[in-house]
Amino acid sequence: MLSLPHALRFLLASDPDALTLVLGVVYRAIARHLINQAGLARATGATGAVTLVQRFGSALNLNIHFHMLFLDGVYLTEGANSPTFRHVAAPGANELQALVEQIAARVGQVPGTSRPDRARHRERLAGVRRTTRPAG
């Protein structure tokens, strides 16, 4: 499971394109890590995952987060032979911390997710709220 900072949760809840970009960044970072750990290159290794984007917490509070299940290894896809599976050992605490930091840095580079971008997004939403009148 990957939780996100509160400000980013609000942004992603209201911007499906940004949510898609962030999910892609997370997937690619983990897949690349697995492929590298297997000693393969992206051209010769492939992994897979299933992701559930959960939008609410148990108290029905807004809580965008990802539940991701990755293969515990990589398929070697080189040549005409059938793909061969290579198991990758579970990451240690330091390795996991480095991967989380890498994901955080990359998510911060996604357009719309930096602090100034989030501030502009809040201003835009506030403007929409001010100009929207209840029907009736």
Q: Could you describe each region identified by the protein language model?
A:
Residues 1-136:
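Beta->alpha loop/short-helix hinge microenvironment recognizer with preference
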